[in-house]
Amino acid sequence: MGRLISVSFGLLVVFLSLSGTGADQDCLPGWSFYEGHCYKVFNVKKTWEDAEKFCQKQSNGKHLATIEWLGKANFVADLVTLMNSDPDLDWIGLRVEDKRQQCSSHWTDGSAVSYENVVHNTKCFGLDQKTGYRTWVALRCELAYHFICMSRVPRGA
């Protein structure tokens, strides 16, 4: 029981820090502010490409979330943990799409990879609930998951 109260209190603190800063007034309702950007978790499932298009339609300058440093990674992980209604995987705005790209790995017999046969040769990335949304996982782009959109705070806001 004590652990449940501790976890509940911890989530309350995270929620208040995400939604009660006053700076989030620069974001649209339902969006959370962090370091000059607004973020929102969408609890509908879409493919990576459809999620990116959906984010772009929300407003000019919106995209799937970009995670450029540890502080932002922690913020996004906490936001997804709090706002995701169906914990699983969530798309972020990272995709590898170079048809000439070769893996730098090795096969189990030690030979170098000189050929790659990946479906659509495209890898999209998401956050995994199993790691508290703190690690990126390569996923098939055509699968549908929840996603996080991000936008810059408008100048002068």
UniProtKB/Swiss-Prot annotation:
Alphabetized UniProt keyword annotations: Disulfide bond, Hemostasis impairing toxin, Secreted, Signal, Toxin
Secreted among keywords: yes
Superkingdom of the source species: Eukaryota
Keyword Transferase: no
Disulfide topology: 27-38, 55-149, 124-141
Organs and tissues of expression: Expressed by the venom gland.
Signal peptide per UniProt: 1-23
Record localization: Secreted
Sequence ranges assigned to domain C-type lectin in this UniProt record: 34-150
GO molecular function: toxin activity
Gene Ontology CC terms, in alphabetical order: extracellular region
Listed InterPro entries: C-type_lectin-like, C-type_lectin-like/link_sf, C-type_lectin/snaclec_domain, CTDL_fold
Additional record remark: Shows greater sequence similarity to the alpha than beta subunits compared to other heterodimer snaclecs.
Family: Belongs to the snaclec family.
Oligomer and partners: Heterodimer; disulfide-linked.
Function description: Interferes with one step of hemostasis (modulation of platelet aggregation, or coagulation cascade, for example).
Protein name, as recorded: Snaclec A16
Species of the source: Macrovipera lebetinus (Levantine viper)
